[in-house]
Curated annotation (Swiss-Prot):
Record's GO cellular component terms: nucleosome; nucleus
Description of post-translational modifications: Phosphorylated by the catalytic component of the Dbf4-dependent kinase (DDK) complex Cdc7. Monoubiquitination of Lys-118 by Bre1 gives a specific tag for epigenetic transcriptional activation and is also prerequisite for histone H3 'Lys-4' and 'Lys-79' methylation. Deubiquitination of Lys-118 by the SAGA complex is involved in activating transcription of a large subset of genes.
UniProt entry tagged with the keyword DNA-binding: yes
Localization in the cell: Nucleus; Chromosome
Protein name: Histone H2B
Length: 123
């Protein structure tokens, strides 16, 4: 068994062994994609005086990812059934109607239609 060294001594030994030159670049930290800023913006529109914990934000982010994945999978299935190679807004709309219950689906479809109309008119 090798002899134990103190934490500081081991760190110093590790640093001395590596030659750092100006050409060496720092590793870039990989960005973690999240819907957190958008969830926060919607929260502030609905309840301006309410905050959200990081745990709740993580849960909301997982929820949004899950719903998007379900919609995408259902839209893909619909396109495949109809022998189409492109997922259009029609497939997305049908997928939403199939996945979401009753009134929630109606609201989602109307908001989606409104967003698509706004996007196409801005072009």
């Amino acid at each position: 068994m090798p002899p134990k060294t103190s934490g500081k001594a081991a760190k110093k030994a590790g640093k001395a062994q590596k030659n750092i030159t100006k050409t060496d670049k720092k590793k870039k930290r990989k960005r973690k994609e999240s819907y957190a800023i958008y969830i926060y913006k919607v929260l502030k529109q609905v309840h301006p005086d309410t905050g959200i914990s990081s745990k709740a934000m993580s849960i909301m982010n997982s929820f949004v990812n899950d719903i998007f994945e379900r919609i995408a999978a259902e839209a893909s299935r619909l396109a495949h059934y109809n022998k189409r190679s492109t997922i259009t807004s029609r497939e997305i709309q049908t997928a939403v109607r199939l996945l979401l219950p009753g009134e929630l689906a109606k609201h989602a479809v109307s908001e989606g239609t409104k967003a698509v109309t706004k996007y196409t008119s801005s072009k």
